[in-house]
Amino acid sequence: MADQETAQSPIEEPSESAAQAAAETLADAEIPATDAAADASEGVVDDIDVIPPSDPEHLTTVVRGQDTAAAVRTAAIFDEDDEDEDDDGDEVGNDLPSFRKRDARDASNADDPDAAVMRKKKKKRHHSPEEASSMRHVTDGEVEQEEEDPYANMTEAEIRRARTDRMIDEALRAGKKKAPRKRAGEDDLDLLADEEVAALRREMVTAADDDEEANRLKKPATNKLKLLPKVVATLQKNHLQQSILDNNLLEGVKRWLEPLPDKSLPALNIQHQFFQILERMTIDTISLKMSGLGKVVVFYSMCSRVEPKIKRSAEHLIEVWSRPVLKRSSSYRDRHIASAEWNREALSQRAGPLVVGSVADNNRRNVGIPQAVTAGFRVAPQSVAGQRSDSGHEARMANHKRLNQFKSRLKEAKR
């Protein structure tokens, strides 16, 4: 009768104390890592029929031919898998005893094949950093739709490679973004430079007019001297050179260098400062025509009241500025130097009278006074050491000439 009752009632409900005793027995027991043990564990899984419990306080299992500890272990594994698959909001995992999860980990660490298979079902999904951050920010009462994982069908190596490529692309895109040239007031630096130069030009013209008026009234003209440090500081700034040419600040320089109404020249410190700055500046032909500065510089090169140093500076400026007008290159390599071949007969004919005079004066006992000889040579001697017989030198010179012509055309096109 007992056997029949057991067959008719295949479901047993062990008490809570029995489950705890079985768990303690399982924790103290050692599972041998042999082939026989593995076969035995596989047989346990095959002989067990598991019914997921609706009540978390009871475990319902049917065991045929095995002990209670193995049944509890297998039920714990299946219950843990059911907890992962259950998304209906019931807090089943929180009510279950904690020894079940430890048992599942111990089973996987003990090389249990069935436990390893069950653990593989709980693989975590790989989410990108953007997806993880978006999934964390979920407002109350709203359910965020799960986005598709781009790394779902990739291996670990492919995921690492894809993430590395993505980081490289983001770094390259970030490097292409150039911050605009802005200041704290969000103003363009070029616009600020133009405004600064234009304001200074107006101040220079006003100071020149005031000094001319004071000179007519026989009063001291000191307005230009007061403004001179500011003008010199602005002209010496390299980043303002283009703005100086565009806003025609050279017109103010011309007004300051012009003679006053009583035919007197401006102050010497104004002359020295301006000519030193003009020698360092690169001024194009169009800016010279607009400002009219060339006429004033020619006047300084021809005036006898100008100091020799300033006069030499004016002559040098005229030589440099006139080369583009005469279509001559400013490069020293392209400059033509007059040379002549050595002619011994011409030299002997030129030295003949000197020899005769020296013979006639041999009877004189007194010594002649040495006289200065002007060494103004116009013809350079022909260089023999630097001659090149190869034709490659001529080809390089021709290429250099074509390059200079192309540069000059490019400058004219930009203007």
UniProtKB/Swiss-Prot annotation:
It comes from Mycosarcoma maydis (Corn smut fungus). Transcription factor involved in RNA polymerase II transcription regulation. May function in both SPT15/TBP post-recruitment and recruitment steps of transcription. Residues 98-108, 128-140 have a biased composition (Basic and acidic residues). One of its GO terms (cellular component) is nucleus. Residues 1-154, 381-415 are annotated as: Disordered. Gene3D superfamilies: Conserved domain common to transcription factors TFIIS, elongin A, CRSP70. Signal peptide: none annotated. It comes from the Eukaryota. Belongs to the IWS1 family. Residues 78-93, 141-150 have a biased composition (Acidic residues). Residues 7-40 have a biased composition (Low complexity). It is found in: Nucleus. This is Transcription factor IWS1. Residues 251-328 form the TFIIS N-terminal domain. The lineage of its organism: Eukaryota, Fungi, Dikarya, Basidiomycota, Ustilaginomycotina.
